[in-house]
Amino acid sequence: MHQHYDSATQTYVNTDEQGIVRGLTPEEPIVSDADSAQVAAQKYLEQHAELLGVEPAALDNLTAEREAQPVDAGSEFRIHTEKQQFDTTTVAYDQTYFGLPVWEASVAVHVKHDPYRVVSASSTRHPDLTAKRPPAKAIERFKEIDQPTLASLLGLKPGAKAAKSLKITSTRLVVYQYEAAKRQPEGEAPGDEELVAHDHPSLPLPPLPASIVEDGHYVSAVVHFQLGTSRFPLLNWRAIIDVATGAVLHLRPFVDDVSALVFEEDPITTAPSGPLPNAASTLLNPKRKSVALQGLNPPSNGTQALQGTIVTVSDVESPAVAPPTEPTGTDFNFDSRTNEFAAANAYFHCDRFFRLVEGMGFNLASYFGPTPFPSPVDHRGFGGTGNVINAHCLGLAGGTGILQTAFALADLNDLTHPIGIACDWRVVLHELGGHGILYPHVHSPNFGFSHSAGDSFAAILNDPISAAPDRFVTFPWVNIGRRHDRPVNGWAWYGLNDVGGYSTEQILATTHFRIYRSLGGDAALPVGIGSRKFAARFVSYLILRAVGSLTPATNPPKVDQGWVQALLAADLGDWTTEGHIGGAYGKVIRWAFEKQGLYQPAGTIPPVSTEGQPPPIDVYIDDGRHGEYQYQPVHWECQAIWNRRHPDGLTTHENPVVGHTNYAYVKIKNRGTKKAQGIRVKAFHANPTIGLVYPTDWKPMATAQLAAPDLAPNSAVEEIVGPFKWKPTQVGHECMFMIVSAKGDASNVSNFSPGETIPEWRLVPHDNNIGQRNVVPVAFKGPKDWMAVISKLPFTLKNPNRRASRMQLVATLPRVLVQRGWKLELLNASGSPIKGGSLKLGAGKTSDLSIRLVAGEPFTAAEVVKWRDAMIRIEGYADGILIGGMTYPMAPAQKG
């Protein structure tokens, strides 16, 4: 993908390698006066047709329905669907030709509500489309296609056993672009990264006639049918058949599987790590954990079955292994190496996944479409003897939802005492989080560019508590070579290994995992567990919401032709059920794909092996990351912001004088590839507080904003902006904030509507346009002097959450002072020590605090200069999430 900024419309434009526009992102959401999301989308397309590369005439029938039979019409767009999630509606328009939908070709507009405002648009349209209209007789033949005709077209021999199970479920006409590589699913042969080959059902299709050419468009019939195989007695398929010749252009079974993966939170993930899957029950059993099986139906006639409101364990595939039952009041407690244990795990994990999705605010019935609930799960299936290491998720007719999920084994060394692969939460996440969520939205088990996002869920949701020796092995119990830390050299987008399937899935998992790490996944343990869990949950929500915005026509054929845009649109929407406003993480998402090789300069010839380019304009305040987005826990220590007591322009920080005019300064740079113009810097201050909320707690300085000189690209120059006049009123050094923006690079605060608020910990570290300084240098001559000054620097702890939270303060002293017996106590407003640094605060409530030092062995100012950690740092946590802090460097006494 290449990206440029269109200054006329203030829009970022993404184009593919052929220069076709694939995405539009306004610098700021475009507010519409429309009375519906569809009207807002229609107006946006009409106003931006040229920018999107669409002829205005192609938009004349946006509200018309797609045709069932060919009519006299060229390439145009017609309404397909509206999909609402939380506060955002995706309005999707199918590209049509002859009035028929063009397969997987669409324009989608993402519209946020109250008021309606367009946040982005994506396109998978086919440029320069032409197709021949087939004869009327050929069209009539496919109106009434029967089983024998279809069997012949599929290459099945008359009277063959397989043909007897053939049943047509639906047909419709489309325009399809033929690609030889996509005619049938190709099995991935074993190699350096795989231990076993991946088996996909296929049929002996007849050869294509000479009239079928690569990239040609053909009026075709989409035929959904059932056809059993030896492994899958009930299997739904899709064939796309050229109407004129009867040639099968595309064939897919609605099934997908993952090979050689294997336990609950698997024994490698849980501490202590181990044992391996070939271990005996005596070694595996200690890893078992007693959990409540939620949603079970009441016992019937004194017998409890593994059947619930969301999931039911059923023997729907061979081998015939009936699920266990227990007398009323008896737990499902079994040895690890038993089919019964696998059944209990199958119920728990599959139910757990659906409840995870539901708990994030997604309605199961609407998100999973026609998927029947309770969803059938076979703990010991997969066809035949089932003696394989595998699992799969089958689709309904037409691939519109989940038919059933089946699990085989996790180890083949002891088939007398089998251990099921359903015991591995990571495998369940790959199946249901990968294929299960794709079926109802794109009517396929796969993305157009990658196997799925299942590896991403497996990696991200298991990482916060993982004890695995290598956190980047995606399935650590039986290592099949799949990783989520693939280097850009060799594993870039459009690189050597971006070939689809499991290979590209590793590139996708690496990119998603980088987002997770930036949002808190790299927080230090054990204190950072809350930040890790929040990041894992939020990134999982973004992936779910992005998938939920897709349609069969917008299933991304390439990562930069719909998926990146879907993630960015998901971020801009508000997570209404959790109380998180959207728009905080878009820059991190863009950066994560950039680091994996996307956004190359125009004209770059694949294979890509280097990181991509930053945005054209990317002004920033350097917090030590040079404008990038690696995890930054101490986001409040930005040294590019400082105070002077006089407007002298010097760069050494001076503590502000309360009640007097002070002068703030900031350094800014431009990481982008183009010169930044129209730069402005806004300045704010706030009471010395951990847990601040924007904009509630941020007060503009007396000099609220200043213009800044143009900035050269590539961080070549640094400009100092100031002075900003301000008058602090609070003892203890008020917090200082700066926000820089330029034409083409607005801060994330521009994404927020009036009345919306966001805590600093979600805002500041994820927007390089913003800098924050809660740094209070403490001047002293000796230990007693230092103790006295510190005791006079009060601060406030605020709970920024919308619910009551357990607050935790973690204070650190210089290592040398700890060794010399120094201690630090945190005191409440009445002067009493806070036991364990922990207290509970209601939503938005505050507590005034102060610091008391308990002296140990003495030290001198001369010694302090040699210490690398000569500071007190106080970190604040709310329900385990790092929300901010205060830092007090030890410094020689200042003059003046």
Summary of predicted features, one role per range:
Residues M1-A160:
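Preferential activation on post-signal-peptide N-terminal prodomains/segments
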Residues L283, A322-G361, F368-E611:
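Extracellular protease catalytic domains of secreted zymogens
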Residues P607-G896:
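Extracellular/luminal regions of secreted and cell-surface proteins that mediate adhesion/ECM remodeling
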Residues V39-L51, A58-P115, D242-A247, P253-D256, ...:
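Active-site-adjacent structural elements in enzyme catalytic domains
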Residues S123-I212:
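Charged, low-complexity helical/coil segments in non-catalytic cytosolic or luminal regions
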